[in-house]
């Protein structure tokens, strides 16, 4: 996930949207809709060893994206050869077409037997963020296994999901699986630097071919364990939206000179004051805008006392709830556009007044705001004509995808979660606070869902784009199992039947 883009953290959305003791819903027709017997998601010991070794090998290839102009293209090319070697059946099946897009991204077209069924697409990305050796218990690109965990950059973001998709398909194919519903697999090579040459080009290619997708599934949320107070059981969050983003450069130009006779204000001082004002003046709290307010009102009775009383009377307690959400950096990101100073550059020598100072601010936009609204607010907060504003890149928040009974992609995820993780009773829609490749597919579908089928605990979160990123062997095997079942569930008819689901 890009920059630091773990979608996990619409946890409050999940809390508010998902804690229900009894949920009245509709579910997809299950086995009765399948025209062929299901292939059981059971793997031999030999297959389980092979799948973990395949992941280790993928981690050992340092497919790092440093910047849009600096990628490890040698590693990206090597990775393409690696997946050909590890998943030979995928590359040599007659109804699968493989294409390289943008030099290093990969598009697989898996042709189903029923052309009347609308196809879907599974997304993952090849590239990873840099990983300096310092602080790691093992080298970050070693793929070493220790105490049941595989360590390395990409084990959670996002080679685990990429390899699980291809591994599951490989295992299905060797058991003579032929899908009813066509689907695509798109592996982008530059997601960590916005996906312009990978996902964007794949999307454009599909659009040129007239493809319209039933839904998209990408990385994003997780099964969250231990994130929500008073919630002892884990819950699954499927992100149905994604925040927007602005990378804004603030620049100050002044006259240079010798430090022995400094001016009253230097470029650094002027810029530092402006940045400080932005940090000390958060964007407005938007609690009450969008679906979050409605979710709180609908689910208030599912919370223990006294929370249920507070949430049932938002006409009175709304300011209190808003303030409480601001106290935690996770929930704060759900109620407002966040402001993060990520880069500051100035100075050429210790005794020279710097002529230029630059800072880059990363805004993550609340779904109720637009790029233009946030830029105007930022200019009003800075309130200094000496500060130049340069928008490096920006995009508005993504639309909210449906999560109702007729939303095929969401219901397929929900069905598969309950099958593979029977201990997880709660599946809730949420918002992705990071940015993913899925935003490039808006022109192909209205259903975009972000879910990574593994457990995540608070201590795991900091390792994503951080130190000692790792995944348990068991978790990876379960991830393969999830994709294995999801692909088969995708062959189900789009009809739905009502049922009462007790949690």
From Swiss-Prot:
Q: Which first-to-last residue range defines the signal peptide?
A: 1-25
Its activity is regulated as follows: Lipoproteins are powerful coactivators of PM20D1 activity in vitro and NAA biosynthesis in vivo.
Q: Which residues bind Zn(2+) 2?
A: 125, 157, 218
Q: Does the keyword Isomerase apply?
A: no
Q: Where in the cell does this protein reside?
A: Secreted
Q: How is the cofactor bound?
A: Binds 2 Zn(2+) ions per subunit.
The Gene Ontology biological process terms listed for this entry are:
adaptive thermogenesis; amide biosynthetic process; amide catabolic process; amino acid metabolic process; energy homeostasis; fatty acid metabolic process; lipid metabolic process; proteolysis
Pathway(s) this gene product operates in, as recorded in its UniProt entry: Amino-acid metabolism; Energy metabolism; electron transfer; Lipid metabolism; fatty acid metabolism
| Pfam families in alphabetical order | M20_dimer, Peptidase_M20
A Gene Ontology molecular function term of the record: aminoacylase activity
Q: What InterPro entries does its record include?
A: Bact_exopeptidase_dim_dom, Pept_M20A, Peptidase_M20, Peptidase_M20_dimer
Give binding positions for Zn(2+) 1: 157, 192, 465
The protein's UniProt keywords, in alphabetical order, are: Glycoprotein, Hydrolase, Lipid metabolism, Lyase, Metal-binding, Protease, Secreted, Signal, Zinc
Glycan attachment positions? 72
- Catalytically driven reaction(s): an N-acyl-L-amino acid + H2O = an L-alpha-amino acid + a carboxylate; an N-acyl-aromatic L-alpha-amino acid + H2O = an aromatic L-alpha-amino acid + a carboxylate; N-(5Z,8Z,11Z,14Z)-eicosatetraenoyl-glycine + H2O = (5Z,8Z,11Z,14Z)-eicosatetraenoate + glycine; N-hexadecanoyl-L-phenylalanine + H2O = hexadecanoate + L-phenylalanine
Main location (coarse class):
secreted
Identify the cofactor(s): Zn(2+)
Q: Name one GO cellular component term.
A: extracellular space
EC number(s) on file: 3.5.1.114, 3.5.1.14
Active site residues according to the UniProt entry = 127, 191
- Briefly state the protein's biological role: Secreted enzyme that regulates the endogenous N-fatty acyl amino acid (NAAs) tissue and circulating levels by functioning as a bidirectional NAA synthase/hydrolase. It condenses free fatty acids and free amino acids to generate NAAs and bidirectionally catalyzes the reverse hydrolysis reaction. Some of these NAAs stimulate oxidative metabolism via mitochondrial uncoupling, increasing energy expenditure in a UPC1-independent manner. Thereby, this secreted protein may indirectly regulate whole body energy expenditure.
UniProt similarity note: Belongs to the peptidase M20A family.
Q: What is this protein called?
A: N-fatty-acyl-amino acid synthase/hydrolase PM20D1
Organism taxonomic ancestry: Eukaryota, Metazoa, Chordata, Craniata, Vertebrata
């Amino acid at each position: 996930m890009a920059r630091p883009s773990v979608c996990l953290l619409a946890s409050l959305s999940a809390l508010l949207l998902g804690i229900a003791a009894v949920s009245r819903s509709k579910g997809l027709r299950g086995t009765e809709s399948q025209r062929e017997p299901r292939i059981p998601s059971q793997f031999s010991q030999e297959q389980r060893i092979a799948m973990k070794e395949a992941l280790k090998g993928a981690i050992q290839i340092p497919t790092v994206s440093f910047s849009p102009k600096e990628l490890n293209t040698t590693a990206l090319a090597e990775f393409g050869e690696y997946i050909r070697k590890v998943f030979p059946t995928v590359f040599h099946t007659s109804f699968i077409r493989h294409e390289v897009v943008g030099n290093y991204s990969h598009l697989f077209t898996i042709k189903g037997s029923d052309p009347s069924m609308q196809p879907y697409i599974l997304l993952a990305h090849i590239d990873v963020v840099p990983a300096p050796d310092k602080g790691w218990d093992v080298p970050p690109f070693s793929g070493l296994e220790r105490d049941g965990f595989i360590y390395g950059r990409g084990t959670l973001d996002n080679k685990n999901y990429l390899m699980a998709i291809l591994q599951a398909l490989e295992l299905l194919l060797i058991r003579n699986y032929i899908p009813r519903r066509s689907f695509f697999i798109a592996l982008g090579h530059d997601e960590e630097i916005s996906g312009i040459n990978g996902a964007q080009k794949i999307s454009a290619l599909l659009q040129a071919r007239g493809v319209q997708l039933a839904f998209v599934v990408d990385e994003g949320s997780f099964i969250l364990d231990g994130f929500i107070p008073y919630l002892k059981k884990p819950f699954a969050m499927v992100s149905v939206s994604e925040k927007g983003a602005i990378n804004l450069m603030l620049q100050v130009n002044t006259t240079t000179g010798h430090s022995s006779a400094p001016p009253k204000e230097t470029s650094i001082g002027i810029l530092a004051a402006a940045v400080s004002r932005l940090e000390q003046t958060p964007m407005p709290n938007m609690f009450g805008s969008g679906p979050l307010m409605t979710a709180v009102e609908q689910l208030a009775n599912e919370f223990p006392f006294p929370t249920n009383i507070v949430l049932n009377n938002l006409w009175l307690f709304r300011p209190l709830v808003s303030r409480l959400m601001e106290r935690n950096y996770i929930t704060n990101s759900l109620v407002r556009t966040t402001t993060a100073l990520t880069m500051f550059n100035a100075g050429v020598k210790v005794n020279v007044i710097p002529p230029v100072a630059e800072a880059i601010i990363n805004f993550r936009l609340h779904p109720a705001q637009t790029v233009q609204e946030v830029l105007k607010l930022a200019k009003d907060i800075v309130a200094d004509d000496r500060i130049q504003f340069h928008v490096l890149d920006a995009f508005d928040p993504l639309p909210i995808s449906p999560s109702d009974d007729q939303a095929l992609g969401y219901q397929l995820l929900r069905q598969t979660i309950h099958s593979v993780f029977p201990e997880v009773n709660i599946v809730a829609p949420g918002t992705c606070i990071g940015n993913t490749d899925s935003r490039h597919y808006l022109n192909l579908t209205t259903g975009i869902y972000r879910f990574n089928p593994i457990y995540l605990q608070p201590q795991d979160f900091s390792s994503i784009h951080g130190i000692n990123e790792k995944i348990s062997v068991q978790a990876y095997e379960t991830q393969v199992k999830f994709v294995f079942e999801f692909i088969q569930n995708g062959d189900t008819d789009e009809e739905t039947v009502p049922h009462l689901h007790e949690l």
